[in-house]
Structure formats: C-alpha cells, structure tokens
C-alpha cells in the first residue's frame, strides 16, 4: 500500500473564517506582509510563519500514530 501525504489546497479561502467576510487573497497577502513583528520592535515586514512545521514532519507524526495503532499485529485488533 502506498501512503501519500495530505497537501492543503493552494487557495487561501480555505484558511479564512467561514462566518467572516470573504476577502481577496491578494489583500490578505498584502496585509500579512506589512504587519509588524511585535518581538523585534522595528517596522520591518515579518517573515511568514510556517504552519506547525513542514508537511514532511506532520506526515511523519501522523504515520507514527498510525503505526502505533497497529502495533502488536493482527490479534491485537480483536478481529
């Protein structure tokens, strides 16, 4: 069996609040690029934050949890 990682859609509307007004993706990028980083105190644009690590590390964590569920073999499942 081949496992493929889940890749989020490229479109930004998925990450928006469903109840809030829909904004243009270019507007979201412009707003996030001009926001200040509160820790630095300078007016420089902040770096975009990664979503809890790379897709590879998230995939490895999910795969480890999946394998842990089936540890013990066929008899441990109680089937």
Curated annotation (Swiss-Prot):
Q: Which domain of life is it from?
A: Eukaryota
This protein is called what?
Answer: Protein FAM236D
What organism is the protein native to?
Homo sapiens (Human)
Region of interest (Disordered), residue spans: 19-48
Family membership noted in the UniProt record:
Belongs to the FAM236 family.
């Amino acid at each position: 069996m081949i496992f493929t990682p889940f890749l989020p859609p490229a479109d930004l509307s998925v990450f928006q609040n469903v109840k809030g007004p829909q904004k243009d993706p270019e507007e979201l990028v412009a707003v996030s690029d001009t926001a200040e980083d509160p820790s630095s105190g300078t007016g420089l644009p902040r770096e975009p934050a990664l979503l809890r690590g790379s897709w590879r590390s998230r995939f490895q964590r999910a795969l480890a949890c999946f394998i842990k569920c089936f540890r013990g073999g066929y008899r441990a499942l109680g089937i």
